């Protein structure tokens, strides 16, 4: 599943091709995505795209009339292509531009979304209760400590809770906890301020580095140019259960936590 770095890499890839371009059509071949594509989505036709933003793992394509809210789901991708590019399987939506280019949405599993919002997007039900962006100053040790106070849940589950901080999915939660030396099952409310300070710094550093490297290469993710990301070459724990720890040589443990695969080092990561 594309996580925050992959979505940000996609935003960076498509934005230069979309901003200040006029939309001449929205071709919907299959409206049966995670939520049905609303007919209102076609209100973007005739509009000029003002900016392309990201909120959590949602891409926001802004016009004066409203905002297209796009989610890549489990396997979705967005590509900038010439308008006459042949349609392939799972090419569900084309945003057609006046300059002869298209933004094509491909989603084999159809867990993605293409919605329309005329309200201030912060008021949309999918966005209104989201926590702070991890790469902004709003995500800091004081905010995290307050959000975790009294919580008995495992820290990894809290780190993946979009009400606490957005965009820290399974891959990067595993990696950040390893880098911070914190056991993923540690009780969130009992982690002291010093360790939380390290954790916040590692979340920011790991996400920023993943964006710089182009996102994580998993079987489904390619960027807006169809190229894979490269961060998977640098993963320390995710997907490496049973292999040796890169720091101490101990075998990495693999468990299920919140129905997600969790990998950690029982020596380097403590409760």
From Swiss-Prot:
Its EC number is 3.2.2.23, 4.2.99.18. This is Formamidopyrimidine-DNA glycosylase. SUPFAM superfamilies: Glucocorticoid receptor-like (DNA-binding domain) (SSF57716), N-terminal domain of MutM-like DNA repair proteins (SSF81624), S13-like H2TH domain (SSF46946). SMART domains: Fapy_DNA_glyco, H2TH. A zinc finger (FPG-type) spans 236-270. One of its GO terms (biological process) is base-excision repair. Binds 1 zinc ion per subunit. PANTHER family: FORMAMIDOPYRIMIDINE-DNA GLYCOSYLASE. GO terms for molecular function: 8-oxo-7,8-dihydroguanine DNA N-glycosylase activity; class I DNA-(apurinic or apyrimidinic site) endonuclease activity; damaged DNA binding; zinc ion binding. DNA binds at residues 90, 109, 151. It comes from the Bacteria. It catalyses: Hydrolysis of DNA containing ring-opened 7-methylguanine residues, releasing 2,6-diamino-4-hydroxy-5-(N-methyl)formamidopyrimidine; 2'-deoxyribonucleotide-(2'-deoxyribose 5'-phosphate)-2'-deoxyribonucleotide-DNA = a 3'-end 2'-deoxyribonucleotide-(2,3-dehydro-2,3-deoxyribose 5'-phosphate)-DNA + a 5'-end 5'-phospho-2'-deoxyribonucleoside-DNA + H(+). The active site is at residues 2-3, 57, 260. NCBIfam families: fpg, PRK01103.1. Its cofactor is Zn(2+). The gene is mutM. Keywords: DNA damage, DNA repair, DNA-binding, Glycosidase, Hydrolase, Lyase, Metal-binding, Multifunctional enzyme, Zinc, Zinc-finger. Involved in base excision repair of DNA damaged by oxidation or by mutagenic agents. Acts as a DNA glycosylase that recognizes and removes damaged bases. Has a preference for oxidized purines, such as 7,8-dihydro-8-oxoguanine (8-oxoG). Has AP (apurinic/apyrimidinic) lyase activity and introduces nicks in the DNA strand. Cleaves the DNA backbone by beta-delta elimination to generate a single-strand break at the site of the removed base with both 3'- and 5'-phosphates. Belongs to the FPG family. Pfam families: Fapy_DNA_glyco (PF01149), H2TH (PF06831), zf-FPG_IleRS (PF06827).
């Amino acid at each position: 599943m594309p996580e925050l770095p992959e979505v940000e890499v996609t935003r960076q890839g498509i934005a230069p091709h979309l901003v200040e371009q006029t939309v001449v059509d929205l071709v919907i071949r299959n409206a049966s995505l995670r939520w049905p594509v609303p007919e209102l989505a076609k209100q973007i036709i005739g509009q000029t795209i003002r900016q392309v933003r990201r909120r959590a793992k949602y891409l926001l394509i802004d016009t004066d009339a409203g905002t297209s809210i796009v989610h890549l789901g489990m396997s979705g991708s967005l590509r900038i292509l010439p308008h006459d590019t042949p349609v392939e399987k799972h090419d569900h939506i084309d945003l057609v531009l006046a300059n002869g280019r298209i933004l094509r949405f491909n989603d084999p599993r159809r867990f993605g979304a293409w919605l329309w919002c005329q309200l201030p997007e912060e008021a949309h039900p999918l966005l209104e209760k989201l926590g702070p962006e991890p790469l902004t100053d709003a995500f800091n040790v004081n905010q995290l400590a307050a959000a975790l106070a009294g919580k008995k849940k495992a820290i990894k589950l809290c780190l993946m809770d979009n009400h606490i901080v957005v965009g820290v999915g399974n891959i990067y939660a595993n990696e950040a906890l390893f880098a911070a030396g914190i056991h993923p099952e540690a009780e969130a409310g009992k982690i002291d301020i010093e360790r939380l300070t390290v954790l916040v710094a590692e979340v920011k550093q790991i996400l920023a580095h993943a964006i710089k490297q182009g996102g994580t290469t998993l079987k489904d993710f390619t960027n807006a140019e169809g190229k894979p990301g490269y961060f998977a070459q640098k993963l320390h724990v995710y997907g490496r259960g049973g292999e040796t720890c890169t720091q101490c040589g101990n075998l990495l443990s693999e468990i299920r936590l919140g129905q997600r695969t969790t990998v950690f080092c029982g020596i380097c990561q403590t409760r």
